[in-house]
UniProtKB/Swiss-Prot annotation:
Belongs to the iron/ascorbate-dependent oxidoreductase family. It comes from the Eukaryota. The keyword Oxidoreductase applies. It comes from Arabidopsis thaliana. Pathway: Secondary metabolite biosynthesis; flavonoid biosynthesis. SUPFAM superfamilies: Clavaminate synthase-like. One of its GO terms (molecular function) is metal ion binding. Residues 156-256 form the Fe2OG dioxygenase domain. InterPro entries: DIOX_N, IPNS-like_FE2OG_OXY, IPNS-like_sf, Oxoglu/Fe-dep_dioxygenase_dom, Plant_2OG-oxidoreductases. This is Probable flavonol synthase 4. Residues 1-25 are annotated as: Disordered. Keywords: Iron, Metal-binding, Oxidoreductase. The keyword Iron applies. Fe cation binds at residues 181, 183, 237.
Amino acid sequence: MEVERDQHKPPLSLQNNKIPSSQNFPVVDLSNTNGELVARKVAKASEEWGIFQVVNHGIPTELIRRLHKVDTQFFELPESKKEAVAKPANSKEIQGYEMDDVQGRRSHIFHNLYPSSSVNYAFWPKNPPEYREVTEEFAKHAKQLAEEILGLLSEGAGYLMKINYYRPCPEPDWVMGIKAHTDFNGLTLLIPNEIFGLQVFKEDRWLDVDYIYPAVIIIIGDQIMKMSNGRYNNVLHRALMDKKKTRMSSVVHIKPPYDMVVSHFPNSPAAIILPSSSL
């Protein structure tokens, strides 16, 4: 089947030019008992990269495995079954299943997770049967992790979950999984499957993110960048397709309410963060 190419001119040429790996990609160990040191490492990573991995984050590895299993089982269902929880056509509703391209190589499903009043189970798959149980258990752990990182900044925030699914693509040089962007929300928690394709833009080049399973990748969004008056970096990133294998990622977006006006903290943008000079 011929690939419907994105409008890239020239192509990405990923197979011909080795994109350098981010060998110094920041990793933060949340099991460290020195809370001040952990906070400084998070601040430093947010300033310099706008993205980092956390290990020993409290989300059980077995739960991550079960989450990827039920997500894969859903996306491998016939299209007619997935359409039962599809996002309504021409609707402003964000929740539900949606195919991103006519050839079915890119698709996703959105769920609101928090607050509970925003959750609409009509858009939650009933097949596989364990989908809701596993997703809700993961949501509890994801909320705890987000609050640990954000502290009081996460109070009153909404939690939106998205599962991205990218089928193998014969010409990955020509088709982008997700085009380069920054996240509009405050904070993103991302857990990929074993086929990883996330890249970040730093120092005028794209870098592969060296993923450490089962770490959680933390991405600083536009709202945190604005609240910190630019000290924290809203990183530009993108996702690639794979020629032979299916890629999938489970993503939780933490966002302020839609009617909230977001602004930087007055007087001193450093008031909410610890200095990193002693690292």
